Regions:
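Phosphate-coordination/substrate-recognition cap region in phosphate-metabolizing enzymes
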Residues: 37-101
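Loop-to-helix element that buttresses phosphate recognition and phosphoryl-transfer chemistry
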Residues: 4, 10-64, 115-129
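Generic beta-sheet signal
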Residues: 3, 142-148
């Protein structure tokens, strides 16, 4: 099975440098063009199914990428980005002033601290691990397109490669790029990371 991983297009929150987990934030014009370009890059990819998070920015990206292709879609809540609670749509400079104790704790030990009234990294990692474990149900799908978020997809890559959760930072996913993981005979291989090349069948 091949897992085609795509981060949603650029959003206004990305441009403004804000924490955007579950908060709605629309694609920018650049983000819209990124998604359309991905449709060109992956026009020949034989997707059997597309999985998106509940958040509109992933679904909008999938709409633009697929451009009318009739690919079955499933909304997967566990693919949602980490929930930042009171920090949603806030800049780190503001948090340093307005929530200094909790923000300092988060910066010092992000794997065990949590955003104020938000989701801990441990809970987030478990949610993504549960999704990874559920991929077996899609074995009849040879090519699965997953449109998600920076944190969720980077963490998914690390977990599928049987690496510690903290290794997610080795796999930053850029806007407007596609990545590819292949699972075969109980082995998982990262074939492509952050490509803007036109995919062609081998």
């Amino acid at each position: 099975m091949k897992l085609w991983l795509v981060r949603h297009g650029e959003t206004q929150a990305n441009v403004d440098g804000l924490y955007s987990g579950h908060a709605p934030t629309p694609l920018t014009e650049r983000g819209i063009q990124q998604a359309r370009s991905l449709g060109d890059y992956l026009q020949a990819a034989p997707f059997d199914q597309v999985l998106c998070s509940e958040l509109a920015r992933t679904q909008h990206t999938a709409d633009l990428l697929l451009a009318g292709r009739l690919v079955p879609r499933q909304i997967i809540p566990s693919l949602n980005e980490m929930f930042f609670g009171d920090w949603e749509m806030r800049h780190h400079r503001d948090l340093q002033k307005e929530d200094p104790r909790n923000y300092a704790a988060w910066c010092k030990d992000w794997q065990h601290a949590a955003p104020t009234n938000g989701e801990s990294f441990q809970a987030f990692a478990q949610r993504i691990a549960d999704f990874a474990a559920s991929l077996g149900q899609y074995q009849q799908r040879a090519n699965l397109l997953i449109v998600g978020h920076q944190g969720a997809l980077s963490l998914l890559i690390a977990l599928l490669l049987q690496m510690p959760a903290a290794a997610m930072w080795h796999f930053p996913l850029a806007h407007g790029c596609w990545s590819l993981i292949e699972q075969r005979d109980d082995f998982t291989t990262l074939r492509v990371l952050n490509s803007q090349a036109q995919w062609r069948a081998e």
